C-alpha cells in the first residue's frame, strides 16, 4: 500500500535512533567514557507537497508515526485515505514524511491547515486560538473490558519495545495490550505523544481491536484526546493524569487509569470497563 523510501540505511544489527558520544562522570572527570544517547531529529509531515507540522522525534517507526499522527489529529479517518508515504532523509539531519492523501481528505486539511513547529511531542504549539486545542470527540461506546488482575503482567512487558530506552534511558513507550494482558506490540520515542502516535499507527495497520493502550508516561489531555479520536476506550498510564485529561476522558467516556504500578492503579474515569 505504501511506497516507503529512506535516504539513510543502517548496517545490520544497528539499533535505529541511537548514537554514541564521549562523556565524563562524577568522581572520574579525568576519564572519557563512550556512552549511548538517543537521537532526536526534526521530522516534517508534508501532505500533498505542503508542509503541515515539524515535530521533534526519534528517527524510527516513522511510517507508523505518519499514519498515527494523521489519524489522531483528525486529518484522516482511515489509513486507507493515505495513498503513499515517502520517508526522505535530508543532509542536515532532518527527515520529511511525504504523505499523499486522497483528494477529499487533502481538501479538508487545507481548510484548517496551520503551520506549527513543535517541541518534543508538544501538541499545543502553534494553535491559533483556544478553540483549536480541543477537538470535538463523539462519546466512545462501551465495547471493551480489561481485568486489572492482568495489569502487572502488562507492565512487565512494556520495556520490551524500548530498545533505545534500554541503552539510553531516554524514551517513552506506548503499547497495545490485549484483554489477557499480553503486549501485542508498541513503539518508543523521545516524545511521549509521538510514541503514542506511532503505536496508534501500528494499531491501525495491524487491525488490533480488542484491548487497551498502556503508556510509560503521565496522561496529558492530548494523550486522552488522541486515544479517543482513534477509538481507544481504555488508557492506562504509568504516571499521573492531569486535571484536563480527566475532564476530557470523562466527557468522551474513556476509561482513564493512572499510577499503574505493580499491585497498584488509580482509576479516574469510567471504571465500568474494568474487572477487578
UniProtKB/Swiss-Prot annotation:
Note the Pfam families from the entry: FdhD-NarQ
State what protein this is by name. Answer: Sulfur carrier protein FdhD
Q: Which residues bind Mo-bis(molybdopterin guanine dinucleotide)?
A: 259-264
Q: Where in the cell is it found?
A: Cytoplasm
Q: Which PANTHER family does the entry link to? A: FORMATE DEHYDROGENASE, SULFUR CARRIER PROTEIN FDHD
Active-site positions on this chain: 122 (cysteine persulfide intermediate)
List the InterPro entries hit by this protein, alphabetically: Cytidine_deaminase-like, FdhD
Q: Which organism is it from?
A: Photorhabdus laumondii subsp. laumondii (strain DSM 15139 / CIP 105565 / TT01)
Family affiliation? Belongs to the FdhD family.
Q: Give a Gene Ontology cellular component term annotated to this protein.
A: cytoplasm
Return one Gene Ontology term, BP aspect: Mo-molybdopterin cofactor biosynthetic process
SUPFAM superfamilies reported in the protein's UniProt record: Cytidine deaminase-like (SSF53927)
